A protein has these predicted regions:
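Long, contiguous binding/interaction regions
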Residues: 2-105
């Protein structure tokens, strides 16, 4: 029986950063170590898993794979408009920590 080892994406990349992309959108940047690492993450990171993690529909996620920079960008609508009374993450910084915990093969 083949065992599958799962690891967290944050352990496999140089850095994951999340930030506002205006008051209505968030962007996550995944900085890979090199081209080999980029190709691995590109193949392992499924957009539907990210959608499930953040509890949004997959069609709402805009994904940009940028091999020349070894970067993957994910953008999606904020769950709340930035600065509204119920906004608990004004700068969108907590999303990186959540994505770092996502398990991949």
């Amino acid at each position: 029986m083949k065992s599958s080892t799962r690891t967290k994406i944050g352990q496999k990349v140089r850095k994951i950063r999340s930030k506002n992309a205006g008051p209505f959108w968030l962007t996550l940047d995944i900085f890979c170590v090199d081209v080999e690492n980029f190709n691995y993450i590109h193949n392992q990171l499924k957009t539907n898993k990210v959608a499930n993690l953040f509890q949004i529909h997959e069609s709402k996620i805009k994904r940009f794979d940028i091999p020349d920079l070894n970067v993957i960008k994910l953008s999606f609508p904020r769950p709340r408009i930035q600065g509204k009374a119920n906004d608990t993450d004004m700068h969108g910084a907590s999303y990186a920590a959540l994505l770092e915990e996502l398990e991949i093969n």
